[in-house]
Amino acid sequence: EGRWEKVISQVKKGDYVFIQFGHNDEKTDSARHTDPGTTFDDNLRRFVNETRAKGGIPVLFNSIVRRNFVQPKDASIAKDARQTPGEQELPKEGSVLFDTHGAYLDSPRNVAKEMGVVFIDMNKITHDLVQGLGPVESKKLYMFVEPGKIPAFPKGREDNTHLNIYGAR
């Protein structure tokens, strides 16, 4: 997408560069997909190396939690139904957050350790926040828009991945 090139071109000595990827790397679209343990990790190493080459200070994060609440009995299902076309949706919203990131959460931690980079577990931080708020209150952090409230989303929007302005703060 060319976004990294814009960022790295502006990095100066002493700048902190916060590096967090994963949500789009999980997609099946070949233009975006990477695999944890191989191509995903290689990209993280590249970003760390390029940041250091410019005199910047890289900090690696794993992905924030998706707001996917399931019934307690479904909280440990082994696969993410979003990844298999044609499969049923996840069960009706429940009270327990379901991990959709799998091994993508480990890669930034592993690369940070390997390369001597600070790692911040944003998944744990946001998981605890969202789980603590619960299914109803946590919607206030994400892009849940009532129909007719915002011109860009005339029919409304229910987005469990992207934070709104309040959630991003």
Language-model segments: residues:
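Alpha-helical cap/lid subdomain in secreted, periplasmic
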Residues: R3-R169
